[in-house]
Amino acid sequence: MLATLGTAFLAGNVAATPQAAAPAQPANPLQAQVGQLGVRKCANLFSALGQTVALGSDYSGQVQTEKAAPDAHGVVGVLGMTYKTAAYNSQAAGVVVATPVGTKCEGQLVRVAPFQRACKDVLALLPAGSTAAGALSGVPLYNLGGNQGQAMLVASGNACVVVTIARGADIG
């Protein structure tokens, strides 16, 4: 699976922790939510993508699917995340999607993380082996080292918004 998804500030912290003021949550709140919605087919992939997009953060999220037939439709989650690490101390947002395709499931995640520094300075946080992949309408695109997906670095004044994109699928 994807380890850091493109930013070094996520490396090394594998489990999300509940917020101090929040009531006790299961180890994986997204797994609990899809279970409550009756999602079984893509639940494991969705949960893994959710844990990956939120790696190293305190987070909460909302999950949606077709209530009448949850295993016949995609499941979508939106997450709000707070990071408190030496390299990154800010908020971020994520979107996770898992959809049945035949007998398996495929999914994607997107994370949006603003940095209060120039994009040229954020480049050093990309995983080793990351390479430039061109530009999309002037927005730099990078293939992340370790086959961890892609990242776009969007300049916003003196800040840089990192948009990380990755795919996942059931294996086996």
Please name every model-derived segment.
Residues 21-100, 166-170:
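N-terminal secretory signal peptides
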Residues 10-19:
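Sec/Tat signal peptide C-region and signal peptidase I cleavage site
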Residues 41-46, 107-109, 119, 123, ...:
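Short, structured motif recognition centered on aromatic/hydrophobic residues
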